[in-house]
Regions:
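H-loop/switch region of ABC-family ATPase nucleotide-binding domains
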Residues: 197-198
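Conserved ABC ATPase signature
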Residues: 136-140
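Helix-to-loop junction immediately C-terminal to a conserved catalytic motif
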Residues: 50
């Protein structure tokens, strides 16, 4: 089932068009990694799909950005005097009552989301998970903050998750763990997940399809092996990136 459908989409800013005439669709149940040189428009496209900035032309259909999308940006801002629990709980606010009170179900989803990203089991006796939830968000490293923001996106339980370089601050084991988690959510829960990344090796190994973007040639969307065999990565990055 097609969930995101872009037709002749142009993205950018009032003074500059970054990409134009993009037509592609993303399906439910797949994880797509978006690759491309710096400045080609990956983050701009994500922000447009999330509804944070208007398209300059064309259409985006198949979902409602404000209701159906969770977005994780690459910048990790400090939120002073706020616990990890409270940051993740922000993902549940659209579902709370007028008073903003969290239900027992909300609390369970918060715990499960953090446990998934942390690679822990969500049990009542898990004291390390409880300590992490109660800790100060601003006191953590950028990598830990990034995992908390991913947990917040999971807690929103939206059909579409958009992530801008979600593994940028993580070490290799946690990069793999996060991408494995996102792929499992796509395959098992039918989510549409689009990730902007520079992790070419992991994207080739773990994504269902790759959206390859270049300033000159627009986009190509295909399985990783198809793009590699066609020499698309070499052309996009201007060098033989598969030499040893």
């Amino acid at each position: 089932m097609e969930r995101i459908v872009c037709s002749h989409l142009s993205v950018g800013y009032a003074a500059r068009v970054v990409q134009q005439d993009l037509s592609f669709s993303l399906s439910a149940g797949e994880m797509v990694c978006m690759l491309g040189p710096n400045g080609c428009g990956k983050s701009t496209l994500l922000r447009t799909l999330a509804g944070l900035q208007p398209a300059l032309g064309g259409t985006v259909s198949g979902y409602q950005p404000s209701a159906d999308t969770a977005l994780v940006l690459s910048s990790v801002d400090a939120i002073e005097r706020t616990t990890v629990h409270d940051v993740v709980a922000m993902g549940r606010y659209p579902y709370t009552s007028v008073m903003g009170r969290l239900s027992e179900t909300d609390e369970q989803i918060i715990n499960q989301s953090v446990a998934q990203v942390a690679g822990e089991e969500d049990t009542d006796g898990n004291t390390s998970l409880r300590r992490f939830l109660e800790s100060d968000f601003s006191a953590h490293s950028d990598g830990e903050k990034q995992r908390v923001l991913i947990a917040k996106a999971l807690a929103q339980q939206t059909p579409v998750i958009l992530l801008d370089e979600p593994t940028a601050h993580l070490d290799l084991p946690n990069r793999i763990r996060v991408l494995q988690l996102l792929r499992r959510l796509a395959h098992e829960e039918g989510k549409t997940i689009l990730i902007s990344t520079h992790e070419l090796d992991l994207a080739i190994r773990m994504s269902d399809r790759i959206l390859l973007m270049t300033p000159q040639a627009g986009i190509q969307l295909a399985p990783p092996d198809d793009l590699r065999n066609a020499g698309a990565f070499t052309r996009a990055f201007g060098m033989d990136i598969f030499c040893y």
